[in-house]
Amino acid sequence: MASGYDFGWIPVLLSLFTLTDASSQTVNQELSNIFNELWKLDVNRMEPLTNYNISLQGKAGYIPQGSTNVVDHASSPLFVNVDEAKLSSITTYARFMKLLDNYERSTGVAERVTAEEVTENNSFLDAILETAVMKRAHQYLIGKGKSRSDLRQFKSQLYYMWFRLYHRERNGGEDSSGFEHVFVGETKFGREIMGLHNWVQFYLQEKQNLLDYKGYKARANDVPDADDHVLNVQFSWHGLVKPVASAFVGVSPEFEMAVFTILFLTSTEKTTTAVVNLDEYQLEMVVHRHGRCIGTAYPKLLSSNNRHM
């Protein structure tokens, strides 16, 4: 889970951010509509209390970016359990998980992509393009004039956006990609966590004792529930601390790829933000571009349990 806000992961929302008053936000109704369509089509979403269980424990305190002096308000992991057999049985998750060990964690260290890794990237895209979620996203983007109807061209567009390597640091070789940053996570100069906004990666890193959940982040009267699909959290990873991260929890990789791709392609701004009402949540969706590639993408949780209604 992790930049600005930055953490790609479990259908939970994790990321660095400032909590703002949801009532002051202007909702993008068009994006809300298409994202809710995709939400309903996401048959591969894991169900809380059935396919996974989380333990929220205590509310995390304030810690400045770059500091490692953190008080742990969670003595146990965030994820109590996840039905890994179910995850592995779903093609998009299975192929997604194969990509998580393909990257160098530190920025400034050039990535070397093998032929096998290129094949894995393509296999993952092939899998998500077969889902109803990505088919609807593709249809929407065609209607907006942002993507070609030819499936091969759309796949090439996705590959460039998400997997093309670029320089995140000026020194060294091509050291990053949108997929690595958002879904896998990176560290910068050994001082801060960037990206890592995905719940599956969060769970797997926690399981390996590489990531330590420190507690949830929320406004005074907006305490999260164990069945929430978006969370703000604090955690440490390889000895570094992410003060606030936001991420989806339980959602499928195709859902995250779809919503962030739509937000990216329907705007030309360096940083695009859009407030959307999604299911029972109000979110600020954020995408930062690195040329024609994804720089980062994450959701900020503004309110849950329909408190914004």
Swiss-Prot record:
EndoU domain residues: 27-303
Give the EC class as a word.
Answer: lyase
Q: Taxonomic classification, please?
A: Eukaryota, Metazoa, Chordata, Craniata, Vertebrata
Question: Which one Pfam family would you cite for this protein?
Answer: XendoU
Kindly give the SUPFAM superfamilies that the UniProt entry links to this protein. Answer: EndoU-like
Q: Cross-referenced PANTHER family, in alphabetical order?
A: PLACENTAL PROTEIN 11-RELATED, URIDYLATE-SPECIFIC ENDORIBONUCLEASE C
What job does this protein perform? Answer: Endoribonuclease that cleaves single-stranded RNAs at 5' of uridylates and releases a product with a 2',3'-cyclic phosphate at the 3'-end. The UU and GU sites are more efficiently cleaved than CU and AU sites.
Q: Which residues form the active site?
A: H181, H197, K242
Similarity comment: family membership: Belongs to the ENDOU family.
What is known about its subunit structure? Monomer.
Q: Which GO terms describe its molecular function?
A: lyase activity; metal ion binding; RNA binding; RNA endonuclease activity
Listed name of the protein: Uridylate-specific endoribonuclease C
UniProtKB keywords? Endonuclease, Glycoprotein, Hydrolase, Lyase, Manganese, Metal-binding, Nuclease, RNA-binding, Secreted, Signal
CDD domains tied to this protein: XendoU
Q: Where in the cell is it found?
A: Secreted
* Entry superkingdom: Eukaryota
Report the PROSITE patterns cross-referenced here.
ENDOU (PS51959)
List GO terms (cellular component aspect). extracellular region
EC number annotated for this UniProt entry = 4.6.1.-
Cofactor(s) needed by this chain = Mn(2+)
Gene field:
endouc
